[in-house]
């Protein structure tokens, strides 16, 4: 990254997993490198100039995964738990947490992961005929000082939380999708070296599903401990135990990073969104077919 | 039968001897009585002196006679206890009521037992002196003179030799990297990184391993001022358990004559943790027990077991 600044960030560290700053980069370098047209460069000078008064510091730390990322976390598996037959989302969550407490897990506060979708504005699409890419900007309460920006199948950017402000500045190039905010909230449970987070996924006002995240802190290589993780998942998810997440297969024995967890959450949210779309489409079909039935009752 | 007879004879002699002792005592006390009374009841001083000396002589003669009599009798009595290996306590065997007071048989057993104990203790101390298991020089206080002799072989090795041994071990195991540093004088500290599984801090004194701490691969092993943190333990229960087992291994692998072999055995054992999260327990076949993977590695076979599954 060309614009690597020499100064280290002076941001204080967060509670757990505070992401350390190995080196400091200008956030826009990421954007420029990920295929922005040359016209962006004009904006570049505006953003970094001291005239932008909304930041306490003009420095902006940013790292591109995986090459320059120094931090690690325990191997984590994020999965969806289907809602039990004849039960509400809330009841299924309670069932699951009771099972965890029976196992001996201890409650340890709450967590929240949220995700907002952006799509590239039509005006910025170059003449090369690039398709509009979706970008997801996510936050995780486990890393309160960081913000994650992901492309589907693309690179993952880990930045300071004031990246959100930058996104406002960039609204000519990335536009927020309407009512796209999706988040999961719930309780953290600690069992031995395992950290289990059971959350309710909500889109707008209504609950759409259940997310289960299991982190095994001591191990940092996904392929090493998948069997062990699977045994633990089976102990409380039973028949709903998921298969190995796709991110496990991608990088053979690389060190697992927080960004991998965010990718899993992004995939989970997309899956739930698609399920909702299918549900709505189904309902629409039902409505139209019932209408046509009604019509058929009338003689033409 | 002859025994009983001789005892009977002796008993008679005893009775005579006792009365002879009584006679001796009374004659001796008469001597002192006479001395106490002094000279009296005679008109002339000469008469008094003569009577006193005669009386005193008589008394001494009777003492002499009684003493001779006692000596004669004591020869008759003899020394019956001398024949017995237990000396006087052997006389307990003469007690006719064996059933009520089985003192003698108990005494014999205790005697045998203590004899054996002494014999075995002697053998053990001989063997232990050949193979000194003492890890530190301070404890060799038994013979302070020998201490300087024992030190050169085990505790005072040139740092260059320690470096050589460690670098040889480092080359032996490709998945293990060993970083050696000497922050405080000549004692080496090793930071062993095993694959992407764990890190071990090993504190050495010469080629003796004094302390080990096992931590996770993603845990910080340095203090704020950049030194190796040899005091704080791992945040994860699994590595706290492995630390305990590693300390057990330190005490298990002991060969004071060849300290380099000890370090090599320990490292070989440690290397088996490369599969800490991948190897199921050899006994129950499961990965988890109370939320922990199989943390124990057998010292000989290096097989994985849960702490509670090993013998």
From Swiss-Prot, chain B:
GO terms for molecular function: transcription coactivator activity. Pfam families: Med27 (PF11571). InterPro entries: Mediator_Med27 (IPR021627). GO terms for biological process: regulation of transcription by RNA polymerase II; somatic stem cell population maintenance. Keywords: Activator, Methylation, Nucleus, Phosphoprotein, Transcription, Transcription regulation. It comes from the Eukaryota. Transmembrane segments: none annotated. GO terms for cellular component: core mediator complex; cytosol; mediator complex; nucleolus; nucleoplasm. It is found in: Nucleus. The keyword Phosphoprotein applies. The modification Phosphoserine is found at residue 132. The modification N6-methyllysine is found at residue 134. The keyword Chloroplast does not apply. Component of the Mediator complex, a coactivator involved in the regulated transcription of nearly all RNA polymerase II-dependent genes. Mediator functions as a bridge to convey information from gene-specific regulatory proteins to the basal RNA polymerase II transcription machinery. Mediator is recruited to promoters by direct interactions with regulatory proteins and serves as a scaffold for the assembly of a functional preinitiation complex with RNA polymerase II and the general transcription factors. Belongs to the Mediator complex subunit 27 family. Component of the Mediator complex, which is composed of MED1, MED4, MED6, MED7, MED8, MED9, MED10, MED11, MED12, MED13, MED13L, MED14, MED15, MED16, MED17, MED18, MED19, MED20, MED21, MED22, MED23, MED24, MED25, MED26, MED27, MED29, MED30, MED31, CCNC, CDK8 and CDC2L6/CDK11. The MED12, MED13, CCNC and CDK8 subunits form a distinct module termed the CDK8 module. Mediator containing the CDK8 module is less active than Mediator lacking this module in supporting transcriptional activation. This is Mediator of RNA polymerase II transcription subunit 27. The gene is MED27.
């Amino acid at each position: 990254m060309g614009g690597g600044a020499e100064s280290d960030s002076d941001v204080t560290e967060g509670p757990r997993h505070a992401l350390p700053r190995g080196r400091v980069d200008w956030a826009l370098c990421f954007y420029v490198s990920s295929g922005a047209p040359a016209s962006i460069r004009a904006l570049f000078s505006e953003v970094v100039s001291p005239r932008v008064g909304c930041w306490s510091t003009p420095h902006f730390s940013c790292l591109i995964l995986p090459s320059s990322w120094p931090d690690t976390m325990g191997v984590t598996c994020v999965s969806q738990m289907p809602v039990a037959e004849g039960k509400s989302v809330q009841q299924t969550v309670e069932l699951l947490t009771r099972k965890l407490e029976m196992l001996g897990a201890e409650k340890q506060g709450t967590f929240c992961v949220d995700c907002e979708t952006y799509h590239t504005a039509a005006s910025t699409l170059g003449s090369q005929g690039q398709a509009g890419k979706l970008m997801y900007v996510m936050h995780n309460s486990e890393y309160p000082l960081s913000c994650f920006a992901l492309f589907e199948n693309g690179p993952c950017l880990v930045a300071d939380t004031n990246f959100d402000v930058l996104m406002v500045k960039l609204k000519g190039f990335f536009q927020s999708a309407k009512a796209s905010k999706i988040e999961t909230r719930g309780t953290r449970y600690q069992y031995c070296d395992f950290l289990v987070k059971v959350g309710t996924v909500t889109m707008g006002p209504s609950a759409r599903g259940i997310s289960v995240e299991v982190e095994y802190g001591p191990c940092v290589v996904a392929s090493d401990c998948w069997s062990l993780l699977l045994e633990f998942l089976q102990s409380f998810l039973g028949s709903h135990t998921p298969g190995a997440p796709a991110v496990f297969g991608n990088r053979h024995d690389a060190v697992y990073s927080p960004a991998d967890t965010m990718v899993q959450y992004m995939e989970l949210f997309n899956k739930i969104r698609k399920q909702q779309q299918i549900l709505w489409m189904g309902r629409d079909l039902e409505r139209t077919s019932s209408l046509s039935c009604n019509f058929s009752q009338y003689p033409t | 039968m002859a025994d009983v007879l001789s005892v009977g004879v002796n008993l008679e002699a005893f009775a005579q001897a006792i009365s002879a002792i009584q006679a001796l005592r009374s004659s001796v006390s008469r001597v002192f009585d006479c001395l106490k009374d002094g000279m009296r009841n005679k008109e002339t001083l000469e008469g008094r002196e003569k009577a006193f000396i005669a009386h005193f002589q008589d008394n001494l003669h009777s003492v002499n006679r009684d003493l001779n009599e006692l000596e004669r009798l004591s020869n008759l009595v003899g020394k019956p206890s001398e024949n017995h290996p237990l000396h006087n306590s052997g006389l307990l065997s003469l007690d006719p009521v064996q059933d009520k007071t089985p003192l003698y048989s108990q005494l014999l057993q205790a005697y045998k037992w203590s004899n054996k104990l002494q014999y075995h203790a002697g053998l053990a101390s001989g063997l232990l002196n050949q193979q000194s298991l003492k890890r530190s020089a301070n404890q060799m206080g038994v013979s302070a003179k020998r201490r300087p002799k024992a030190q050169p072989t085990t505790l005072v090795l040139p740092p260059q030799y320690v470096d050589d041994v460690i670098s040889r071990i480092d080359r032996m195991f490709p998945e293990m990297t060993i970083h050696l540093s000497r922050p405080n004088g000549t004692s080496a500290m090793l930071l062993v990184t095993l694959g992407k599984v764990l890190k071990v801090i090993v504190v050495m004194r010469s080629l003796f391993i004094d302390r080990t701490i096992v931590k996770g691969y993603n845990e910080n092993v340095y203090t704020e001022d950049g030194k190796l943190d040899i005091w704080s333990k791992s945040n994860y229960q699994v590595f706290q358990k492995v630390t305990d087992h590693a300390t057990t291994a330190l005490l298990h692998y002991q060969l004071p004559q060849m300290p380099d072999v000890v370090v090599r055995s320990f490292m070989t054992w440690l290397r088996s943790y490369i599969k800490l999260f991948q190897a199921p327990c050899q006994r129950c076949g499961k990965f988890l027990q109370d939320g922990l993977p199989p943390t124990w590695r057998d010292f000989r076979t290096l097989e994985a077991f849960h702490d509670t599954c090993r013998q």
